[in-house]
């Protein structure tokens, strides 16, 4: 087992990474203060891991809360089901909420924990690659709104993150690829040597090689923790973690939540951010194509939806969380391994980016 630390003073917490950690009662006992535990999971994950985690927590009074699966359920109605269960079982302020699942479960369980009786403890047990390397770390919680993704929520840190890498054995290949979009992101924004390592090891990761997976998760979490330590509430450098997300969130919102997986939309959005960085002269086309090839090798889409027009992107991007005083800001690359958040770009460059022929741009690169 490997352990990293998110250093936030009194709200610091460990990230444990290893195989079969769901069975390690000691990792949970030190972070649970009361006798009541609510395990929030979904219909897909529950048959796989709920009984095991319940057994691990057998010394507590456990309430299972099983939600419908999918991004389309990340809303007020589903959040209310968590509150209904907590109140129905008379959970008090010493309750610990445990999120067992992917990013949707983690975001909603965390938001419920932040809100229930004005805040109870919670622990993240992420079971998808995307949630293990990104959404479980850093305290972002929330739900979607029809007008925008993740627009309602709170910053609320977990007491611990327990990453059981063995859960990836049951993850569909499409979901694994979606998680790789966030892994590749770290190499692009802050760790070019990691990008080089990924180019050499992407096939091992996709074949679930234990050592390669653990290394990728550890390096991703270390990068995320470093950024969160410096900027917990996304007032500065943390926003660089959103490379590709402004374009990607527009895709998710326009196409309908869940039609494109989050990582798939981020991948296509990353290609758009790379193209815009290239248009600005910050990175060369060779660097742009290098990143696109890696995304392709990860099994990810690199072309935005054909049915989306530039105006569709602009309308959705106008409600992005990085918009300040009506000004759109984007995460772009100054160079490989260095990202910047900026609103200082010509409108024409953005329009050229939105209208580019990404099919023609990427088809010659191959997978």
From Swiss-Prot:
GO annotation terms (biological process): amino acid biosynthetic process; aromatic amino acid family biosynthetic process; chorismate biosynthetic process
GO cellular component entries: cytoplasm
The EC number(s) this enzyme carries: 4.2.3.4
UniProt KW Lyase keyword: yes
Named cofactor requirement(s): Co(2+); Zn(2+); NAD(+)
Pfam families: DHQ_synthase (PF01761), DHQS_C (PF24621)
Top-level taxon of origin: Bacteria
Cofactor note: Binds 1 divalent metal cation per subunit. Can use either Co(2+) or Zn(2+).
Reactions accelerated catalytically: 7-phospho-2-dehydro-3-deoxy-D-arabino-heptonate = 3-dehydroquinate + phosphate
Pathway this chain belongs to: Metabolic intermediate biosynthesis; chorismate biosynthesis; chorismate from D-erythrose 4-phosphate and phosphoenolpyruvate: step 2/7
Cell location: Cytoplasm
InterPro entries linked: Dehydroquinate_synthase (IPR050071), DHQ_synth_AroB (IPR016037), DHQ_synth_fam (IPR030963), DHQS/DOIS_N (IPR030960), DHQS_C (IPR056179)
Ligand binding (Zn(2+)): 182, 245, 262
Alphabetical UniProt keywords: Amino-acid biosynthesis, Aromatic amino acid biosynthesis, Cobalt, Cytoplasm, Lyase, Metal-binding, NAD, Nucleotide-binding, Zinc
GO terms, molecular function: 3-dehydroquinate synthase activity; metal ion binding; nucleotide binding
Matches recorded under PANTHER family: 3-DEHYDROQUINATE SYNTHASE, 3-DEHYDROQUINATE SYNTHASE, CHLOROPLASTIC
Function, in words: Catalyzes the conversion of 3-deoxy-D-arabino-heptulosonate 7-phosphate (DAHP) to dehydroquinate (DHQ).
Family: Belongs to the sugar phosphate cyclases superfamily. Dehydroquinate synthase family.
UniProt protein name: 3-dehydroquinate synthase
Native organism: Stutzerimonas stutzeri (strain A1501)
């Amino acid at each position: 087992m490997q352990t990293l630390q998110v250093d936030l003073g009194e709200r610091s917490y460990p990230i444990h990474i290893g195989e079969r950690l769901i069975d390690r009662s000691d990792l949970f006992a030190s972070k649970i203060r009361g006798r009541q535990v609510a395990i929030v999971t979904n219909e897909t994950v529950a048959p796989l891991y709920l009984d095991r985690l319940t057994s691990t927590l057998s010394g507590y009074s456990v309430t299972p809360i099983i939600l419908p699966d999918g991004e389309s359920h990340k809303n007020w109605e589903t959040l209310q089901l968590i509150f209904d269960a907590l109140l129905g079982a008379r959970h008090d302020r010493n309750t610990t909420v445990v999120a067992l699942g992917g990013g949707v479960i983690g975001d909603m369980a965390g938001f419920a924990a932040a809100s229930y009786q004005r805040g109870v403890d919670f622990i993240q047990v992420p079971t998808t690659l995307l949630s293990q390397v990104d959404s479980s770390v850093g305290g972002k919680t929330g739900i979607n709104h029809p007008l925008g993704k993740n627009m309602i929520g709170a910053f609320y840190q977990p007491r611990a993150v327990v990453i059981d890498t063995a859960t990836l054995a049951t993850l569909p290949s499409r979901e694994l690829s979606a998680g790789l979009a966030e892994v590749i992101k770290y190499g692009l924004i802050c760790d070019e040597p990691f990008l080089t390592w990924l180019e050499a090891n992407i096939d091992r990761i996709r074949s679930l090689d234990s050592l390669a997976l653990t290394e990728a998760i550890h390096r991703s979490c270390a990068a995320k923790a470093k950024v969160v330590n410096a900027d917990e509430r996304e007032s500065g450098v943390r926003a660089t973690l959103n490379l590709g997300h402004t374009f990607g969130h527009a895709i998710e919102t326009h196409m309908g939540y869940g039609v494109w997986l989050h990582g798939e939309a981020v991948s296509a959005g990353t290609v758009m951010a790379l193209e815009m960085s290239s248009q600005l002269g910050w990175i060369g086309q060779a660097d742009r194509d290098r990143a696109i090839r890696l995304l392709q090798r990860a099994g990810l889409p690199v072309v935005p939806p054909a049915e989306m027009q530039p105006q569709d992107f602009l309308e959705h991007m106008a409600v992005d969380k990085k918009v300040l005083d009506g000004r759109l800001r984007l995460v772009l690359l100054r160079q490989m391994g260095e990202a910047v958040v900026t609103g200082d770009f010509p409108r024409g460059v953005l329009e050229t980016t939105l209208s580019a022929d990404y099919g023609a741009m990427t088809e010659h690169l191959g997978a």
